[in-house]
């Protein structure tokens, strides 16, 4: 894929080879979101317009997943907006890692695979021969308590929940 910025900062995306009837996996994190979300959308659209057989978005970090509901007046549901845009450009599948809010998978009728990095993380931790005797997995908020408890159980360590409050 060739990415090019015009003098005004506008992005141009082009596939440099024929992808007609090919399965195309586009791997793109959405961090930082301002530029990477547009890059992702343009690459997905370019693949579809180049007659790819299937277009699969692999998004290791799915930005805007925290904005999964209308938690106060006059705010968007940004996760939904991003998935609507991905749907409009025409994708066949989405793969994302460790979603902040797994329920966003229901915002789109496209197959959505939610993958967990914990398997690779646990295997890597074993290589360090760490002593987990006094270890604790900390959950930063109530929303992460369930997954944090499962990590603690798998590692055989304690679990703690932090009371996080944001200033208004």
Where are these regions (language model features)?
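PRPP-associated nucleotide enzymes
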Residues: 1-168
